[in-house]
Every structure is written in structure tokens, then in C-alpha cells.
């Protein structure tokens, strides 16, 4: 221990049952010997030291000795994991020196263009949890005002290089990604087994929900374990040609996960940040060919074909600079895909499609076949234009279902009981007519209000889609909840706005 450290008061580390998300937080008593009012105040940034380990964290001060005593320092659960020193160990606390890269953040706020080196330094500090959420927000807001093509390339490269980088022996490694915003739409879980059954390599790393009722990882977790590390992932892909796992556990582009956790609550969703976010993860995952799905609709992330075209050009530009073959398609984003919204309901849709069940959602089946067809045609041995027929053969024959079961077995079948919520209510049409519009944002919010994705059995089962005729009092959808309080909140939310629009005739005036 250095002379400086030995002069500072030693505080005993205590585990505090606080989940502070991605931010490191430490708590000390107002009566602590280490608390000097002229140096420390609430929400100060501090540096914790123990042996050769250091940790930057946000400081909270408490008057409750039951939480931490005067000779203790409490670490939130994320901070305790990252510091990797056990409770009971002694550590010192001192004012933190701000990361040098914060000067680049200030420059960006002033409207300056950042160098590759400056962007790399910011991302490195982000990935090592040296920034507070406020400092991350400052970087995001500064970048949202403008970003040059050079900065976008530098940001993508830095984010891809910040975490695990996967390499595969196969010359063609395919992947697909949707920019999100459409309820249901669980095409990846149908596409992966189709493509893997054909023999192409498709190591799918997926996200968990942040503002939606379910991410692909949340839905796959109903069926199988998704917290899989990089080496185990490689073994699964070697055995099955594919997987569907949570990308966060593999540590692909960790800076992106941190940025997303701050930008989503602020509703910051710039096109440049989206491109860097998606492509950095695909580059880190070792993909050679990427199919991008851009849904377009009134309540989708993209509301017009012109918006989609601008985003498409940006994806293709960045992909080309990194040697990644990027194909972009626009799809119908006017309404949910599939009948279920929420992890259990979406998983049931997926297995119904793979099992060729009579009641399987036709829109999920058809969209999945179209996407799989594009990916299959990256196989040089497959005749051009034959992708759709091959995808349908693999689905109809049961080969895709068999491959999905193989992937589930390799990842490890889920051990949790995932049942639908037992508190349910129907939302009914208030008039006769034809469904002319469905608000995707509204249904996403309603499913989250019902408890998804935390409660995997919460969500919405749709009975009516655009173009369907309804009679007054006929159910539009059923909402499932697992908790009485969430049930009451969902009832109130649905009563305020059920998210459906009606017309008297097909393509008629909406009311």
C-alpha cells in the first residue's frame, strides 16, 4: 500500500442490497472518519482502492447506521461485482480524478469534431465504468447534435473493439437484425433454426428488453438458457450451426449496452448512434453477412420510406468500410407481427410456427420465411432465387423444429416454470367496423404495464389485426397479468386508450 493510501482512513467493505443498474455506487455514513465535507458531498465521484484494485463510483451519504456504520463503506451490487474484493476487506476512498477523455465530451458539446483517438478514449473509459450516468448523458447529447461520417466510423470501430471479439472458422457467417419497435415480431427465433438446419453458421446474439415488453433474449429464455459465455457459445455453434443467446453475457460491445441504458430513458435515438450500436455488435460477433430489417409504419421507429432509405444508406456505408456485407430490407411496420406480445406468448407463437400448427400466426411464418430466404442465398452452393423454396422445405418438413430443439438442448432447457399470468381481461371493440390501425407504441406500453418482461407470463394475445371486421363488444385482445396491482394498472391503461382505430369500410375513414 502506498504512503498516501496508508494515511487515509481504512473503511470496511460492506455489501449493500442496492441494484444501481450499470452505475457503481458507494455509501458512507455521515459520521464516517473518511467524510470530509470540504472534499465530499452527495453524488461526488470517488475512487475506491484496495490492494491493486481501483473503482470509480458515485458517492451517497446516509444517516442510517443500519445501512453502513461509521467505519464501513457500502458497495451496491454492481460495484461489489466489479471491484471483486469481498465484503469485510478494508479499502480507502478519495476524490476521483476525472477521466482525461471528459475533455473530448466537452469539446463535442461545444460543437467540435472529435478525432479517432478522442472517441476511442471516451469509449474505453465508458466500457470500464469510469463515467457517471450524467457524464454519459452529456456525451450522448453532444453527439446527437451532429456527427460526421468520420466520427461515426471511429465510434463504430471503438465500440466493436471495446469488448469480446469472436472469430469463426467458416468463411460465411450470417446474421439478421431488426431495429425494433414492432410488438411480437419474434422472427429471429424462427429464422435461426431454418438457416442452421440448412448448414449455414448463424450465431445469433440478442438483446433483452429495455423499453419493450420482450427482447429476443427474454423470449428465448422461456425455452432455454441464454446467459452463455463466449467459449460455450462457440461449442454450441459448432454443434448446432447456430444459437440464440443474450449478447450482454458475451460482453460484445459493452460500451453500447452502457450507452443504451442511458439514452433510452432520455428518448435519444439518433440514426448515427443506432448504426454504430448495431454494427459494432455485428462486427464484434464475427459476422460476414448481415440482413437488416427496417419496419416502416405510423407508430414504428421509421414512419416513411424516405426515412428508411436514408438509414439504409448509412448502414451500407459503414458496413462497406468495415468489409461487412450489409443487406437492408424494409418491412410492414403498421401492426404487431404474430399473435402474442410478451415472452411466454411470443415463445408460443414461435413454437407454433416451427411446429406447423394449424393456429400458428401466418404473418410471423411468412415474414420469417422471407428473411430466411435472403440469408440462405448467401450460400454460394444455393441457386440464386431458390432461398424461399429452401426455407419453406426446411420449415414444412420439421427440420427447422428439430434444429430448434437441438439448439435448446445445447444451450440448456429452461428450468423455470413459465406460465401465462392467471389474471386476465379482454379489451373489446366499442363499435362495429373494420380495424384500420393499431398503435404499436401503445400496445408495447400496455404489455409493459401488465408486467412484461419482468413477469414472463404477462402480455397481450391479439385476436384482431388490420383489415379484420369486428362487432361491438367483440374482443380485440386479451391482457394477461401476474400481479393484482399490475392487473389494475393495465385495466386503467387499456380503458384510457386501447390502441385500435376503426373504419366503416376497408381503407375507409378511420374513427
UniProtKB/Swiss-Prot annotation:
Pfam families hit by this protein:
Glycos_trans_3N, Glycos_transf_3, PYNP_C
GO molecular function annotation: 1,4-alpha-oligoglucan phosphorylase activity; thymidine phosphorylase activity
UniProt keyword list: Glycosyltransferase, Transferase
A single GO BP: pyrimidine nucleoside metabolic process
Q: Which GO terms describe its cellular component?
A: cytosol
Cite the Gene3D superfamilies for this sequence: 1.20.970.50, Nucleoside phosphorylase/phosphoribosyltransferase catalytic domain, Pyrimidine nucleoside phosphorylase-like, C-terminal domain
Which domain of life does the UniProt lineage start with? Answer: Bacteria
Quote the catalytic activity from the record. Answer: thymidine + phosphate = 2-deoxy-alpha-D-ribose 1-phosphate + thymine
Can the keyword Transferase be found in this entry's annotation? yes
Protein EC: 2.4.2.4
HAMAP family (UniProt xref):
Thymid_phosp_2
Which family does the record assign? Belongs to the thymidine/pyrimidine-nucleoside phosphorylase family. Type 2 subfamily.
Read off the PANTHER family from this record. Answer: THYMIDINE PHOSPHORYLASE (PTHR10515:SF0)
Output this protein's name. Answer: Putative thymidine phosphorylase
Q: What is the lineage of its organism?
A: Bacteria, Pseudomonadati, Pseudomonadota, Alphaproteobacteria, Hyphomicrobiales
Amino acid at each position: 500500500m502506498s504512503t498516501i493510501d496508508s494515511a487515509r482512513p481504512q473503511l470496511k467493505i460492506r455489501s449493500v442490497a442496492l441494484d444501481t443498474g450499470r452505475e457503481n455506487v458507494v455509501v458512507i455514513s455521515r459520521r464516517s472518519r473518511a467524510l470530509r465535507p470540504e472534499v465530499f458531498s452527495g453524488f461526488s465521484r470517488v475512487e475506491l482502492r484496495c490492494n491493486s484494485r481501483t473503482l470509480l463510483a458515485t458517492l451517497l451519504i446516509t444517516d442510517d447506521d443500519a445501512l453502513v456504520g461509521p467505519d464501513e463503506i457500502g458497495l451496491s451490487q454492481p460495484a461489489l461485482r466489479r471491484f471483486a474484493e469481498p465484503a469485510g476487506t478494508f479499502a480507502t476512498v478519495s476524490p476521483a480524478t476525472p477521466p482525461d477523455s471528459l475533455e473530448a465530451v466537452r469539446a463535442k458539446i461545444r460543437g467540435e469534431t472529435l478525432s479517432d483517438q478522442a472517441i476511442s478514449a471516451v469509449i474505453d473509459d465508458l466500457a470500464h465504468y469510469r463515467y457517471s450516468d450524467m457524464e454519459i448523458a452529456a456525451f450522448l447529447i453532444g453527439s446527437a447534435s451532429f456527427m460526421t461520417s468520420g466520427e461515426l466510423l471511429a465510434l463504430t470501430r471503438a465500440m466493436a473493439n471495446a469488448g469480446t471479439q469472436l472469430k469463426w472458422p467458416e468463411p460465411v457467417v450470417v446474421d439478421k437484425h431488426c431495429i425494433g419497435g414492432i410488438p411480437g415480431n419474434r422472427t429471429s427465433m424462427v429464422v435461426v433454426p431454418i438457416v442452421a438446419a440448412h448448414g449455414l453458421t448463424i450465431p445469433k446474439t440478442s438483446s433483452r428488453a429495455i423499453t419493450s415488453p420482450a427482447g429476443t433474449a427474454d423470449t428465448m429464455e422461456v425455452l432455454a438458457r441464454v446467459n452463455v459465455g463466449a467459449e460455450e457459445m462457440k461449442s454450441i455453434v459448432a454443434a448446432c450451426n447456430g444459437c440464440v443467446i443474450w449478447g450482454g453475457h458475451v460482453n460484445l460491445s459493452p460500451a453500447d449496452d452502457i450507452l443504451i441504458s442511458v439514452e433510452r430513458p432520455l428518448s435519444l435515438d439518433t440514426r448515427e448512434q443506432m448504426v454504430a450500436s448495431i454494427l459494432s455488435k455485428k462486427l464484434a460477433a464475427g459476422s460476414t453477412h448481415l440482413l437488416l430489417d427496417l419496419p416502416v409504419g405510423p407508430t414504428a421507429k421509421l414512419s416513411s420510406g424516405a426515412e428508411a432509405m436514408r438509414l439504409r444508406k448509412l448502414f451500407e456505408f459503414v458496413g462497406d468500410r468495415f468489409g461487412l456485407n450489409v443487406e437492408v430490407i424494409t418491412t410492414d411496420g403498421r401492426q404487431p407481427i404474430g399473435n402474442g406480445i410478451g415472452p411466454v406468448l411470443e415463445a408460443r407463437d414461435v413454437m407454433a410456427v416451427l411446429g406447423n400448427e394449424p393456429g400458428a400466426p401466418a404473418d410471423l411464418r411468412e415474414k420469417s420465411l422471407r428473411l430466411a430466404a435472403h440469408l440462405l442465398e448467401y450460400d454460394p452452393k444455393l441457386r440464386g432465387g431458390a432461398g424461399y423454396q429452401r426455407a419453406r422445405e426446411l420449415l414444412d418438413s420439421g427440420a427447422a423444429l428439430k434444429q430448434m430443439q437441438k439448439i435448446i438442448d445445447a444451450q440448456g432447457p429452461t428450468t423455470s416454470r413459465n406460465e401465462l399470468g392467471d389474471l386476465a381481461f379482454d379489451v373489446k371493440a366499442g363499435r362495429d367496423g373494420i380495424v384500420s390501425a393499431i398503435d404499436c407504441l401503445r400496445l408495447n406500453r400496455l404489455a409493459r404495464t401488465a408486467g412484461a418482461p419482468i413477469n414472463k407470463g404477462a402480455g397481450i394475445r391479439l385476436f384482431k389485426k388490420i383489415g379484420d371486421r369486428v362487432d361491438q363488444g367483440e374482443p380485440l385482445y386479451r391482457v394477461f397479468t401476474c400481479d393484482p396491482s399490475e392487473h389494475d394498472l393495465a385495466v386503467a391503461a387499456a380503458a384510457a386508450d386501447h390502441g385500435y382505430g376503426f373504419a366503416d369500410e376497408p381503407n375507409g375513414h378511420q374513427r
